[in-house]
Amino acid sequence: MNTPTHALINWTVARSLGTESFPASAVLLGSVAPDIPLYFLSIGGGLWFRFVEGWEPGEVARHMFGTLFYKDPCWISLHNLLHSPLVLIVALVALYFGLGYAAFIKSWWGWFLGSCFLHTLVDIPVHHDDGPLLFWPLNWSYRYASPLSYWDMNHYAYIVMPVEGAIFLLLLGRIVWQRLRPNGS
């Protein structure tokens, strides 16, 4: 799923939990943080392979997303650190037991990790063979093979893309509507 859609989904879910006291920065950062390493790897790798190594753009894309994404330990680790359900569940459980319930539900880190986890849960069903590694770092290759993809036309992206676009527009419209209403709720 596209990163801006994650931000709108996570914001809407946080607002709908019935509390106005959630740390907005944690929710928003957690909604995009799982994708940030791949942005940096893609930009850095794209510039390096294109302008230092002199590769053609197609060659660069095939190498980065056909080889490095699936086989390079650095790429795998950085991309899955905040995308792995296993890592996020362990972190959330450890934080919960470390802080206790009352502090956990108000914790910036709890909201951040919860937002990363929601991002991951939304990603899993819309990535055919490039989704999060479910059991990383214990298993470095297992991904749920969804029949759907948000970008791959061979896996119904022609359906998923407009659905995601509609979700994005509806949630954005809802947020704008709430902000423009006199009472702001």
Regions found by a protein language model. Give the residues of each.
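N-terminal membrane-targeting hydrophobic helices
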Residues: 1-185
